[in-house]
Amino acid sequence: MSKKLLLFQPLRIIFIALTVGLVGCNYVGNLFNSPAITTESSGESNKNLPKVVATNSVICDLVKQVAEKTVNLTCLISPGVDPDRYQPKAGDRQAIEQAKIIFFNGYNFEPTNLFKLIKGSKNGAAKIAVAQRAVPKPLLYRKNGKLVSNPYVWHHPKNGIKMAEVISANLSKAIPDNAFLYGRNTQKIKKQLNQLDVWIKLRIDSIPAKNRKFVATNDDAMIYYTKAYNLASINALEKINNVKPTSGRIKEVVREIRRSTVPTIFIDSTSNSNVINTVAKQAQVQVAARQLLAENLGKPGDNGDTYQKMLTANTRTIVEGLGGTYLIFEPQAVANKN
């Protein structure tokens, strides 16, 4: 072997080692900045991979982050679609019948027609209620006059960690050859969501104490967030959200908002903004410049098109609306010890 080759070989080894180290340390940042997932099965390239179905965009994104490209993933309720108005498509039944694992939220989040498809499938697929398993003692809220379990557990990143762990455990059970990969990815998700939790607390703490009041069209969906970060939730707009309210009801809501002295009210992405704008004008408050993502993730290319980005986008909307100081979330590099 020539002296030149002997000289360059150790340099090459050093370069590879440095590259691997940098990739491991920067994974958390890359995970946060990764592009949005697709909402359809990926087609020809992975047709022989185990088929997995996820019902909503939050669970779908977490499955994608845990599993990477080891499964053929089909996502049913697209980002931006109100789950209550979702109608199963022709291919949904086929995807459910062919799936090895079906991940759904639970706590009655899925519309009845979709839930019946899942429960009625006869293929022996594992049917995993991710939110129910992750958070067995959920918060309660009043719906149609009854106290029921609140399904929107993902609005607290600590619950997001538990959801990722449920997904990872069940993928590992069904596809044991990839268990190491799933466990490693889940640890990376956990590290980043813990960082996000700290960042959200700091941003909410920057809001003046007198403004830490939350009025939104779908504040029931944000209960896990408001409770975790000590925002007083004032359930006013729920009374007129997505219904045709009477003038008397509008006046009642306007009075309640004025009493609350909030500077800004919030609209979520699935609500009708016309009535809310009328209420805001009469109550002399602002409507937040950005919509909240309460029911699902943002559409591909939007600010909230992954789980982590949704949490940061909602936090920005709330902090800026209530007079706090918004600073961009910058995930810290975490070394990969595996």
Task: Locate predicted features.
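Extracytoplasmic metal-acquisition and chelation regions
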Residues: 12, 25-338
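Bacterial N-terminal signal peptides
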Residues: 10-24
